[in-house]
């Protein structure tokens, strides 16, 4: 996608790893592709045993690893049929490998890049973005507008209208295509152990819509709290899960978002001495303090940190240097040699990190997909 999908955490506290998008090179001409919508065929039903014997399950990996931006949705339809027969017959490591390969294949398929070449010119991309806007917001649009799009774009829009793909709204008029994460979960989770099924079902639910919206959050504070609590509880419920490290990463990530916010979503003033007051549509004033007070009463590690958070806010600024000395490790990550180089707002953030025992949390490869993905496209 030509735009950058993710704007990140306050004061550049995160080392962002989630987005691989590139800027659109206007010098490149769009690549010509042929996209033909293949009608689904009806196969004669046979028993699972017979099909398992007849089907080469290795074809799953071979097909998934060759799918790219020039492929068609029909390739996934074929893989789905293979998976339905083969998933019950293989070990868990292979099941996870296929699930990962499947999502990576979808990401390549939905990409607007073919190698180093962007598939649309600026005019075509803007036309596509407008159609995606109209469909997402249920606005009226002319079918002729779709007919004017390049074949690749027409193919993807058709799959959206048929319910096979979703349009993701990144705000500020920027959109993306996603596969249906609930369909992903329905395909894989019946064959997985409970801990793995629970994780995938949760990610499918949380991640279908983007977390980020114009350098802020698309979800409420209370939703962030629920996500942070979920991943904390997951670690206690499934300590031996093969996904335990992913759960730990997600727990730290959402905890950090909860207490530190983002560039355009935050709960405290710069000095972190009081909650920001908002005015709702009825001209009523409110703050987010009640959510943290409620969380502080929760019998959990997150609840204890919420209590420490409220205590920090109540601590006068002139007492914080002694009570909450800045962790040198956090200072070093900011490439600062001493506290004298720190702005007041940044000092408050670093002191709050001390109060909560927090460090910076990288964005996990688990917030844009129904499964945590490897850092490279090589599962």
Where are the predicted features?
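Hydrophilic extracytoplasmic domains
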Residues: 58, 275-379
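Short coil/linker segments at helix-helix boundaries
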Residues: 138, 142-170, 179-225, 257-298, ...
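Bacterial signal peptide processing site
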Residues: 20-22
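Sec-dependent signal peptide recognition
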Residues: 2-9
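C-terminal motif of bacterial Sec signal peptides marking the signal peptidase cleavage site
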Residues: 15-18
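Short solvent-exposed coil/turn linkers within tandem alpha-helical repeat scaffolds
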Residues: 89-93, 115, 119, 186-194, ...
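N-terminal Sec/ER secretory leader and immediately downstream segment
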Residues: 31-173
